[in-house]
Each structure stands twice: as C-alpha cells, then as structure tokens.
Amino acid sequence: MSIADFFKRRLVRLQPMVIMGMIIGAICFYFQDSILWPTIHEVPIWKMILVMFIGFTLIPVPPTLDIRGWAEMHPLDGPGWSLFYEYIGNILYALFVRKFSKTALSILVFLSGCALIHLAVTSPTGDVIGGWALDSTQIHIGLSRLLFPFFGGILLHRVVNLTTIKNAFLWSSLLIIVVLAMPRVGSSENLWQNGLYDSLSIIILFPLIVYLGASGEIKSKTVSRICKFLGDISYPIYITHYAFIYIYTGWVADTKIKISDAYPYSILTLVTSIVIAYACLKLYDEPVRSWLKKKILK
C-alpha cells in the first residue's frame, strides 16, 4: 500500500464522522449557554459557522475563535483534539515509523513511556488530563498521551502472537473494573503517587487488557452481535456525544441539582447519545464511506 493510499483510507474512515460531529456540535451550541459558558449567546452565527467549517478539517482554531471560552482546539466538538493527534500519529507512522525495525520501535515505545511517566508524576494535578488546547503545555500533554498508546499498539501488534485464553472476557472485564474502581490513589500532598498509578495503568494494564480481549473466543451469535454493535458504534458515539454532554453539564451547573435527582437526566443523555450515534452510523457514516471507497479507493 502506498503512502497516498494509506492516507486516503484513514480519511475515508475518520473524516465523515468528524464532519457530522461538528455539525451536531453547531446545532447544539446555543443550547449550551449557561453559567459555565456565559458568553455563548453573544457569539454571532457567522463565527460559529466559521468554526464549524474549520472543524471539518480538524485544523485547530486560533484563540480568537475560541467561541466557548474553554481554550479548546475544537469548541464545537471537544473530542476532536484527540483525533487531531491521531492524525499526527498516522502521519508519523506512514512517513517514518512503519520502516522502523522492532528494536527501533521498542526504543521509541520505551522513550515515549518514560515521557508519559514524567508527565504524570510532575503534573500539578497528578494525572495526564489535558491536551485539548493550543499552547505549549497542552501540546506537551497531547503528544505525551499520543505517543505511547499509538506506537505501543503498533509494537504489540508486531511482536505478540495471540493465543486462546480461557475466560479472557472475564479477566479483561475484571481488570477494567479494578482500574475504574480506583480512579485516584494517594493524597493531595503526594500527587505523584496518582501520576505513577495513572501512567503505569496506561503502560502495563491497558495493553494487557487489549491482549486478553484479543485472545478470547466468541462462540455465541448473540454475544457476537453485541460485540459488533459496540465496535461499530464506538467511534460514532465518541465523536458525537460531547454536544449533549455540554448541554447536560451546563444544565447541572445552572440548576445545581443533586446527583440523586440528576440520574434520570443522566440516563436520558446516555440514551440520546447512543441513539444519535447509531442513527449517524447507519444513515450517514456507512453509506458515505461506502461511496467514498468506490470513488477514492478503487
């Protein structure tokens, strides 16, 4: 496969839903006006539309177009920042990293792992949160969050031979539960401890979870359909859900509602996100990608 073909395939796979995510973000934008983002109602429509069209390209907007006020690369669709870095990873892979030997790739993964640990243990918040703004600090966070998972995944694919592990789904699920059950460790006086926990979870536990999941067997047709559904919807829900999170978060901030009273609205937000994502997948993403494959990848 040529470099040009590789880039075409990545664009066909990712870009249609990038556009849809920005459109949904634009439609929902003015409904997000709240005490968290008190200037939204002052944003002229032409500026919001301009931000939307720039977002179609995933090019980060400059600070002058930060229409939300959160210093986001993509104010209409927050998660777009990570896709921006994914494209950087794809470019690095196509131009350089794909030619690396296993030894060279291992060195790159080791260094990027060290960079991730350094980021986490020296962070003023003791974690790896960030990466969505266009300044030196946030770019450092974004690149550190990109490099190890992206190239570590490539190394894992190259060197690991999958076997069949009994109850792989059970073990991987238990690991996920353990990690999520301990979102933070240590005290506010020792933030480095949580930074070390976060970074080692990313470096050791998450690759292990991926390996276990890939080593399992699916024998039930029902389970197979569920897995396919979750796999198909994962990207659409990722790139479209945040518009509804903005609305929900702003509403909670305005009403100061108790957590116990907010559960129905939380569930409604979750269900809405899933339904919209699935509709986008079936009515837009799959047909558009099929058409693009015939036109561009033939």
Cite the ranges covered by each PLM segment.
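Membrane-interface helix-loop-helix regions
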Residues: L14-Y87, A115-P124, V128-I129, L200-A214
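Aromatic-anchored segments of alpha-helical transmembrane domains
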Residues: I27, L111-T125, L174-S187
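Hydrophobic transmembrane alpha-helices of multi-pass, membrane-embedded glycosylation machinery
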Residues: I24-I27, S112-A115, L155-L156, I247-Y248
